[in-house]
């Protein structure tokens, strides 16, 4: 929503101010391709350790066997931080490297790693969100812009909920 407001001209000051009060996390997604199916049997799992920087680990290959080649698996780790807070070497050492040191992964099973920065990860639900979100969305609606999805509704929507959000506008 803040990005949409920045694109428009002649937006009322109160709407611009409300948009600046909407916040979200950003961070890195670290993907690991593995030549084994021997991974933790959890679709999502959370890590509460300051030395291991991913907050959450997800296994796309557990979600669907079509998400990895036969005999292989995959993990994706979410690290919430600012861009350039860590070097790529630090990201790998404090995520994949930690899982190896804990015997969760074996170094020899790693086929590849991939690191990507996501500017918009999760909406932050702070004290300002409800009032600020309403001001911004009401204004956009008043000028004929309907917003959809996680960052259009500025809420914690999963992929299917984001899709339904768009379909509701179409109907």
What positions do the PLM features span?
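Mid-domain catalytic core of redox enzymes
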Residues: 1-90, 94-102, 135, 139
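Conserved flavin/dinucleotide-binding core of flavoenzymes
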Residues: 59-171
């Amino acid at each position: 929503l803040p990005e949409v407001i920045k694109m428009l001209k002649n937006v009322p000051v109160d709407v611009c101010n409300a948009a600046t009060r909407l916040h979200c996390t950003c961070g890195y997604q670290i993907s690991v391709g593995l030549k084994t199916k021997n991974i933790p049997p959890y679709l999502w799992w959370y890590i509460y350790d300051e030395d291991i920087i991913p907050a959450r680990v997800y296994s796309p290959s557990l979600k669907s066997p079509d998400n990895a080649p036969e005999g292989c698996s995959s993990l994706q780790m979410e690290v919430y931080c600012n861009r350039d807070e860590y070097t790529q070497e630090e990201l790998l050492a404090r995520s994949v490297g930690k899982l190896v040191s804990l015997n969760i992964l074996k170094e020899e099973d790693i086929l590849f790693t991939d690191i990507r920065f996501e500017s918009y990860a999760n909406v932050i639900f702070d004290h300002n969100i409800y009032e600020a979100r309403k001001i911004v969305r009401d204004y956009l609606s008043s000028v004929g812009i309907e917003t959809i999805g996680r960052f259009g509704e500025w809420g914690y929507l999963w992929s299917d909920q984001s899709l339904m959000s768009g379909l509701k506008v179409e109907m």
